[in-house]
Amino acid sequence: MVMEKPSPLLVGREFVRQYYTLLNQAPDMLHRFYGKNSSYAHGGLDSNGKPADAVYGQKEIHRKVMSQNFTNCHTKIRHVDAHATLNDGVVVQVMGLLSNNNQALRRFMQTFVLAPEGSVANKFYVHNDIFRYQDEVFGGFVTEPQEESEEEVEEPEERQQTPEVVPDDSGTFYDQTVSNDLEEHLEEPVVEPEPEPEPEPEPEPVSDIQEDKPEAALEEAAPDDVQKSTSPAPADVAPAQEDLRTFSWASVTSKNLPPSGAVPVTGTPPHVVKVPASQPRPESKPDSQIPPQRPQRDQRVREQRINIPPQRGPRPIREAGEPGDVEPRRMVRHPDSHQLFIGNLPHEVDKSELKDFFQNFGNVVELRINSGGKLPNFGFVVFDDSEPVQKVLSNRPIMFRGAVRLNVEEKKTRAAREGDRRDNRLRGPGGPRGGPSGGMRGPPRGGMVQKPGFGVGRGITTPRQ
């Protein structure tokens, strides 16, 4: 059977997940990702106010990491890019936010070059590492509240398979599927204009991996090729948290630490990443979808992030040539049955011209044109009675200037508009939302697709089938 070589994106995402988890749990072990020829440049200024120079070699990198005083370090990954580079290496670029010692989150960018270790196929170590804070480069301190890092759980669109620690005589093994999801965020640049958007598969999903104890909140998008799924499904947060309670990096690293707890630096082999070659995978078709449920905390945070302009009621429209009055005018509310929605208006249309046109059907008491920049424009016509409204509707199609067909509809009531939105949300792209719980979790355990595993100490492998 022909074995597939793991994609750079799969290698990069799994490396990112484990790197920032170790940064949170055991920063004194971080140097094991590097080798004797590795370089490490971390954001910061030297005594002269210039960007600090890079350090080289595992020993110097360990000193540099310890000088950063990483304590309770939380990371929110917004985006990950990974591409193949020279000599079968992988270059990984990470963008996100980092909080050290419970301080405010700061935006950062970090670039890794993963090079083949050489002794075994699909085994990597960090050859180059460059880290910069955005505020040190562009100025200005861009922050987000720290509580979001500890409490917020983004809504992933694929259920995440829980990690598992598998002991073996040859060392400690760690196996985890990369979560598939779709924000956005997000954040990918995650723009969510509506509190309840319809789920749509997107190429770069973003999720938060939030563990039960204060650990790195890792948001990352999984590659689309990990699982073929036609529609996204939100993660079941509670079971994932219950399973994660059994996992601790302390149990992983304690087997490789000396009794005193000190980390030997001299002569320590580089922490390498072994990525087993994946086998051809069978296509899996999801039989059911997980009912989407948005946590109230997540909903509240999303609404706070969106800058919602204050809603304004309809303003009375002045007649053409009417002098502007300085006194505030009283707003008059008209019944919906007296109003018409007018779409497909020419961009150069004049209010007086449009009003004269509709005066042929009845007395126009108010006319509004919305020209928000998107063509064609639209507006509303208000009559003094419901009879002209029905007269216009019965004479459709309405031709303006003899050539422009206007889209004329009766204005819907607020209850009708909310009912339409509710129906659209319940309908969704694949029928009514909901259905049996416990949908597809991704590739079945023991299946054909293997995820890269990472660990510390004597190298990295994955559990045997």
From Swiss-Prot:
Activity regulation text: Under physiological conditions, G3BP1 adopts a compact state that is stabilized by intramolecular interactions between the RG-rich and the acidic regions that inhibit phase separation. Upon stress, polysomes disassemble and mRNAs are released in an unfolded protein-free state.
Glycyl lysine isopeptide (Lys-Gly) (interchain with G-Cter in SUMO2) cross-link, chain position(s): K374
Bias (Gly residues) ranges: 428-445
PROSITE patterns documented for this protein: NTF2_DOMAIN, RRM
Tissues expressed in: Ubiquitous.
Main location per the UniProt record: cytoplasm
Methyltransferase as UniProt keyword: no
Keywords for the protein's UniProt record, in alphabetical order: Acetylation, ATP-binding, Cytoplasm, DNA-binding, Endonuclease, Helicase, Hydrolase, Immunity, Innate immunity, Isopeptide bond, Methylation, Nuclease, Nucleotide-binding, Nucleus, Phosphoprotein, RNA-binding, Transport, Ubl conjugation
This protein's name: Ras GTPase-activating protein-binding protein 1
Gene source species: Mus musculus (Mouse)
Source lineage: Eukaryota, Metazoa, Chordata, Craniata, Vertebrata
